[in-house]
């Protein structure tokens, strides 16, 4: 009778060992897929922040050139090409980007990124400068 019980338990033993092996394989595969996804998202995040930083650098340079030209023209404020609000928002955006660090343990990293995105759009509109986002139609 013992032999018959062992024969019946073969199926359940195979089920249990297969389940454990599947869990181990799933953990391993999940780690690899998670690593790849994190790597891709990290690259996208870095590209986005780099784009914002490069735009802000160029805009700050344009504002400084504009200010130098205005100072050479007898301080005539009517020659301003950029709005005061736009320049103020550019300063705030510059500060946000300087303070932004890619610390993935920080839970507010995405909140700060969305704040940078909003400030970037607002600043580009107020300064009247073209960006790649403005080139695309939005319906």
UniProtKB/Swiss-Prot annotation:
Family annotation (InterPro entries): Essential_protein_Yae1_N, LTO1_adapter
Pfam families reported for this sequence: Yae1_N (PF09811)
Protein name (database record): Protein LTO1 homolog
GO biological process: protein maturation; ribosomal large subunit biogenesis; translational initiation
GO annotation, cellular component aspect: nucleus
Family stated for the protein in its record: Belongs to the LTO1 family.
